[in-house]
Structures are given as structure tokens and as C-alpha cells.
């Protein structure tokens, strides 16, 4: 598959075939979800899609004020759905590893199960950025912190899997077309992961490749517990991540290839609920707006299947064990 063709397929994907119509009103009563980065962008759009389902949804993010504003906006919809979800705030700062266990403990104090977590949060960082623990900023917030958070919640995922329908308990990671465009050879360059950001898009692409590695290794480790772990590229979407551009450039790229955030939420909806995502496709990579395909670069696919996913997972574990 040529690189131009795969880019075209990611930048201009076919229409979604799995939408909110496939996750009916009231269908998720009794289920508990976490969506990180849910006060804006794709995460916010996903909460809106899931609001009629009756689930309990934790809207996780760094700013309590923005989280509450998002919850107020979504719950004020008129007319109200017949089985509205219960939306709860969860403070989570992925730039600071010392806050992660507290966030997981706050969730566990309220819930006895977790059916799906969408590890969606994570933006771009300028050159020179590091997390509060000195990890390259993209790696810290997109990979190390989300893996720690998910690991802390693992007992609740396992608890849900014991009684939930087969293959319905899922961990959803977030990839990007930047894996193809900017990730280093083999996906992750371990010589750069503990240094400040040296190239914003290359380091972002490496972190997104890291997310797929975590999905692959998560599938290997958690599959026996009935947990499905996948990585999805939501697509090129009009979200706050592009606000760094001036108005002219922003208008140009929106006109060329940015879709409404709702379309990215459809990719996430597919990843969380489609029957195509199951034990047989555990560890899969999902293209916009809901298509299971291999990652678009052969070297990244090869690295993930030849032990680099395990190596990356273990590096993430060592990184947080130094600090928490």
C-alpha cells in the first residue's frame, strides 16, 4: 500500500458506518466509562454522543472549571433524553505523574467497575517541553501517565469483565496520522524519550506510535482477563489542538482536510462498541472513521510485533516507578 494512498485514506476517509444509532438510547445503563480530555474537542463530542445511553460517564481533565462547564452544557440540552447518562467530573493532570494515583483512587472510591476507558487526552508541546518529572512532554502525557492511570484502574476493568458481555470491556488508546508522517524509524527512539522536546511533530508522532505499542502489549497482557485493548486514529479534526495556528492558516487547513470533532467521536464510538472489535482483533489499529487496518508504516508494524511494544511498556513502567 503506497504512502500517498494511505495518507489519502486517513485524511479523506469514507463516511462512518458505525454511529450513535448503533449505540441506542438507554443501552448502557449500569455501565461505567472514563473519557480523558473530555471537556473539549473529540472527548467532548464523544460524551455528547453517549449522553442518551444512560451510562455513568466520568469527564476527566486538568481543569475542574472547564470540566464542569462541559458537563453543564451537555446536561442542559433540550429536550432531555429519556435515559440521560450521569456525568461526573474527574480531575486528572497527565503532565504530573504524582497526581495520577489520586485520580484513580477518587474514581475507585465511587465505582466498583470500569467498562471502557478512552485514553483520549493529549495535545502538542513546543520544543524544549518536559513533563513535571522531566520526561519528554508528549511521551509523558500521551503514554507514561495514561498507562499508569489505566494500570491503577485495572482491578475495576477486571471486575467489569467478569460480568459484562464478552469483549465489551475495553481500553482505547489514541493514535494519529502523524505515526506515518513523523514518527522516527521503528516508531520510538529511546535516545530521545527522556530529553526535552526536540522536534514537536516528530516527538508527537513517536508518542502516537507509543500508544499503538501500548495497545498491542495491553492486548497481550490483559486479553486473558477478557479486556480488549485497541488504538484508534480519530482523524484530522477541527479541535483546539489547531488553535496554535493563525486565523488564515486555520481557515485554510479547515477547508482542506479538517472534519467536525463529531467524526472523530465516531471513530472512538466504533472502538468502544463495534462488534468488529473483539478478542480476535485485540491489539488492532483503527483508522478513521471506524476501519480496522494495520498501522500505515511497515517499520512501526514490524517493531510492534517483534518486541518493541513490550520494551516500550517496560520503559513506561520504569519511568513512573522513579516518581510514584
From Swiss-Prot:
Transcription regulation recorded as keyword:
no
Q: Which residues does the entry assign to the active site, renumbered to this chain?
A: 204 (proton donor), 208 (lowers pka of active site tyr)
Q: Which GO terms describe its molecular function?
A: oxidoreductase activity
Q: Which residues cross the membrane?
A: none
What is the name of the protein in this document?
Short-chain dehydrogenase/reductase iacJ
Asked if the keyword Membrane belongs to this entry, the reply reads no
What keywords does the record list, in alphabetical order?
A: NADP, Oxidoreductase
Q: Which Gene3D superfamilies match?
A: NAD(P)-binding Rossmann-like Domain
> What is the organism field in this record?
Pestalotiopsis fici (strain W106-1 / CGMCC3.15140)
Q: What class of enzyme is it?
A: oxidoreductase
Enzyme Commission number(s) from the entry:
1.1.1.-
Q: Which InterPro entries match?
A: NAD(P)-bd_dom_sf (IPR036291), SDR_fam (IPR002347)
Describe its function: Short-chain dehydrogenase/reductase; part of the gene cluster that mediates the biosynthesis of iso-A82775C, a enylepoxycyclohexane and biosynthetic precursor of the chloropestolide anticancer natural products. Within the cluster, the prenyltransferase iacE prenylates siccayne to generate pestalodiol E, using dimethylallyl diphosphate (DMAPP) as cosubstrate. The probable oxidoreductase iacF is then involved in the epoxidation of pestalodiol F to pestalodiol F, which is further converted to pestalofone A by the short-chain dehydrogenase/reductase iacG.
Amino acid at each position: 500500500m503506497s504512502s500517498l494512498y494511505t495518507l489519502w485514506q486517513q485524511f479523506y476517509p469514507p463516511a462512518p458506518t458505525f454511529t450513535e444509532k448503533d449505540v441506542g438510547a438507554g443501552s448502557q445503563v449500569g455501565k461505567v466509562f472514563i473519557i480523558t480530555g473530555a471537556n473539549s474537542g473529540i472527548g467532548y463530542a464523544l460524551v455528547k454522543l453517549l449522553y442518551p445511553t444512560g451510562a455513568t460517564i466520568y469527564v476527566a481533565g486538568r481543569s475542574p472549571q472547564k470540566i464542569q462547564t462541559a458537563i453543564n452544557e451537555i446536561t442542559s440540552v433540550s429536550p432531555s433524553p429519556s435515559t440521560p447518562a450521569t456525568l461526573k467530573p474527574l480531575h486528572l493532570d497527565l503532565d504530573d505523574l504524582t497526581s495520577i494515583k489520586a485520580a484513580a483512587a477518587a474514581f475507585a472510591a465511587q465505582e466498583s467497575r470500569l467498562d471502557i476507558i478512552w485514553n483520549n487526552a493529549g495535545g502538542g508541546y513546543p520544543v524544549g517541553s518536559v513533563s513535571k518529572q522531566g520526561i519528554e512532554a508528549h511521551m509523558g502525557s500521551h503514554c507514561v501517565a495514561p498507562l499508569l492511570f489505566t494500570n491503577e484502574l485495572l482491578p475495576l476493568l477486571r471486575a467489569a469483565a467478569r460480568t459484562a458481555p464478552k469483549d465489551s470491556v475495553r481500553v482505547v488508546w489514541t493514535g494519529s496520522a502523524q505515526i506515518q508522517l513523523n514518527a522516527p524509524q521503528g516508531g520510538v527512539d529511546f535516545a530521545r524519550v527522556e530529553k526535552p522536546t526536540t522536534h514537536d511533530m516528530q516527538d508527537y508522532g513517536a508518542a502516537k506510535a507509543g500508544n499503538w505499542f501500548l495497545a498491542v502489549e495491553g492486548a497481550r497482557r490483559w486479553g486473558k482477563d477478557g479486556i480488549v485493548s485497541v488504538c484508534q486514529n480519530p482523524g484530522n479534526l477541527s479541535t483546539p489542538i489547531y488553535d496554535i495556528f493563525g486565523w488564515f492558516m486555520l481557515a485554510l487547513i479547515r477547508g482542506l482536510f479538517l472534519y467536525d470533532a463529531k467524526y472523530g467521536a465516531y471513530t472512538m464510538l466504533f472502538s468502544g462498541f463495534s462488534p468488529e472489535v473483539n478478542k480476535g482483533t485485540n491489539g488492532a489499529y483503527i483508522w478513521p472513521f471506524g476501519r480496522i487496518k494495520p498501522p500505515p508504516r511497515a517499520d512501526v508494524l514490524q517493531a510492534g510485533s517483534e518486541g518493541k511494544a513490550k520494551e516500550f511498556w517496560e520503559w513506561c513502567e520504569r519511568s513512573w516507578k522513579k516518581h510514584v
